[in-house]
Regions:
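Short, well-ordered alpha-helix to beta-strand connector turns
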Residues: 1, 33, 58, 98, ...
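Asp-based phosphoryl-transfer active-site loop
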Residues: 2-16, 217
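Active-site phosphate-binding/coordination module
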Residues: 20-117
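Short active-site oxyanion
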Residues: 33-37, 57-58, 202-204, 218-222
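Hydrophobic/aromatic beta-strand patches that form the interior of the parallel beta-sheet core
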Residues: 37, 62, 205-207, 222-224, ...
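Phosphate- and divalent-cation-binding pockets in alpha/beta enzyme and binding domains
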Residues: 46-49, 189, 215-216, 232, ...
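Conserved acidic, metal-coordinating active-site core of Asp-based
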Residues: 97-100, 104-207, 211, 215-216, ...
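Asp-based, Mg2+/Mn2+-dependent phosphohydrolase catalytic module
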Residues: 219-254
Length: 254
C-alpha cells in the first residue's frame, strides 16, 4: 500500500478550482486503491468541496496543519487545541491595520479581526468576536498580511515561535501564517496516518509548495514541489514537478 499526501492551496487547487490534469491524476490514484490524504491548514468545512464538487475520495484529511485528522468515514481520529488565553494573547501581539485574523475549530472558521476581500470566495467563513467563541475548541490561528512583504511576515512568524514556543508552532505560507498547537505539523499528521495504516516511509509521497509542507516532506521517501516555490522549500524535496498529476503518474503509480 502507498500513501500520497498533497497540500491543498497552491498545490492541488487555486481558490477551490482544480485543473483537469490534476483531477484526472487524483481520479487515477483513487482507482488504483492507494491511499490519498490531503494536508492543509484549512478546517473541515472548507474541504468538503473535494467530494461535493469533484467527487474525490479522500482517505484522510489532515486539517489545521495536523491539529485535526479525520478519516474517510468522517470520524475524528486525532485532535489538539490551543487555549483561549494563548489565542487572545497572540492576536493582541500581532494584529495590525494590514492583518486579517481567523481562528479555526476544525469544523468552522471564524474571522475575528479585519475582513477578507469581497471578490474572493472564502467558503465557510463566519465573522464573530473572539470573546463570543472562547468556549469553542480552537485549534488554529490564521494570520493574513496581504500588503506586507515576505520578510515582514517572516519576522512576525519568528516572533510567535520565540515568545510562545512552549504552547504553539507558527508556519509561514507566503503572506499567511498558520499557528497550531505545539507538537502539531503536517509531518506529525502524515506520521500518524503512516503508523495507523502501517505504511513505510519509502511508500509515502508528499507534495506541497510552502514552508508548512516541509515537515511532511521529512516523513515521505518521495517529496515534491514546484519550480515556482521558494528556494527554501525547493531544497527540502527530492523532486521538482509541474503538477500534482505529474507526481502521481510519473512516480506514485509508475
Amino acid at each position: 500500500m502507498k500513501l500520497f499526501v498533497t497540500d491543498l492551496d497552491g498545490t492541488l487547487v487555486e481558490y477551490n478550482n482544480m485543473t483537469d490534469e490534476n483531477l484526472e491524476g487524483i481520479k487515477k490514484l483513487n482507482a488504483s486503491g492507494e491511499l490519498l490524504a490531503v494536508a492543509t491548514g484549512r478546517a473541515y468545512n472548507s474541504c468538503t468541496f473535494l467530494k461535493d464538487k469533484y467527487g474525490i475520495k479522500v482517505d484522510y484529511l489532515i486539517l489545521l496543519n495536523g491539529g485535526l485528522i479525520i478519516d474517510k468515514d468522517g470520524k475524528v481520529v486525532h485532535h489538539k487545541e490551543i487555549s483561549y488565553n494563548t489565542v487572545n494573547s497572540i492576536i493582541i501581539d500581532v494584529k495590525s491595520d494590514d492583518s486579517v485574523i481567523s481562528v479555526e475549530t476544525g469544523y468552522t472558521s471564524y474571522v475575528v479581526y479585519g475582513r477578507y476581500k469581497e471578490d474572493i470566495d472564502w467558503d465557510g467563513l463566519e465573522y464573530e468576536d473572539l470573546e463570543n467563541i472562547k468556549d469553542k475548541n480552537l485549534s488554529l490561528i490564521s494570520l493574513y498580511y496581504p500588503k506586507s512583504d515576505i520578510d515582514e511576515v517572516e519576522k512576525i512568524c519568528r516572533f510567535i515561535n520565540e515568545k510562545y514556543s512552549d504552547e504553539v508552532v507558527a508556519y509561514r505560507n507566503t503572506c499567511f501564517i498558520d499557528v497550531v498547537p505545539k507538537g502539531c505539523s503536517k509531518g506529525e499528521g502524515v506520521n500518524y496516518v503512516k503508523e495507523r495504516e502501517n505504511i513505510d516511509t519509502k511508500d509515502t509521497y508528499a507534495i506541497g509548495d510552502s514552508y508548512n509542507d516541509i515537515p511532511m516532506f521529512k516523513e515521505a521517501g518521495n517529496s515534491f514541489t514546484f519550480e515556482t516555490s521558494e528556494d527554501g522549500v525547493k531544497k527540502e524535496v527530492k523532486y521538482i514537478v509541474n503538477s500534482v498529476a505529474e507526481a502521481i503518474k510519473n512516480y506514485c503509480l509508475k
